[in-house]
Amino acid sequence: MTDRDDLLGWEAVGRLDLDGRGFCTGTLIAPDLVLTAAHCVYERKAKSLRPADKILFRAGLRDGVAIAERRGLQIAAHPDYDPGQPPSIQNIRHDVALIRLTEPITSRDADPFAIHSGRNAGTEISVASYGVGRAEALSRQRSCTLLTERDDVIAFDCNVTFGSSGAPVFARVGGRGRILSLVSAGGKLDSKTVGFGMTLPQRIAELKAQLRRNPVAVPDRRIKRLQAGTGRNSSGARFIRPGGG
């Protein structure tokens, strides 16, 4: 999106800067909750969760300027996602995480997206993401195709690249898209390059319950907000073959 006006209605999609170690895409689903891929919130080598306060959500980022910026306060990654294992259908199915922010972002700045909860999403979908070569501005593929859904894993022909991980895949429902899935990985299906994601309602419900079971103290909001960091490298969609271990 080359103009700030192009962002209208899409401000809730932002870049997740990972303490200078790359970035992913995240989306507000509540004023203080960002939805992204689980593999984005893990340290690659240590296979442990990144410190929440080292993750910076930059809503509606364009040319170095965000609509709003917040640090992470708490992370919930799906317990059935295994960061120690290579990409697989099992991991794609559970590659979901929520990040609670230190302070809500008001709806007048960025209106959170709803989750698609039905089965009849149709085959026409869209994706909005940051990625290699377009890290400073949100890029939106307005039309791509849902190819197949099986065992809570979705395949689509949307263009995914490094940095696209965690990007929302939208079903066209009513006047505003609803989040159908997240970009988890890229791979091959019938010799075609495709993206893979997962169904979301059950996973998100489980992650919200996890956050409620493990509450953390909200910092004093009188403290000055932390400033934006930089994320020069990219941490993005993995390229795998379906069923690969």
Where are these regions (language model features)?
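Protease-domain processing segments flanking chymotrypsin-fold serine proteases, especially trypsin-like
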Residues: M1-L28, I204-G245
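Conserved catalytic-core segment of clan PA serine endopeptidases
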Residues: M1-L8, Y42, K47-I105
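Extracellular/periplasmic catalytic domains that process cell-envelope and extracellular macromolecules
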Residues: D6-G9, L28-I29, S48-P51, I89-R93, ...
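Short beta->alpha transition motifs characteristic of CBS
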Residues: A37-C40, L180-L189
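Chymotrypsin/trypsin-fold serine protease catalytic domain
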Residues: R93-V96, L101-V160, S164, P201
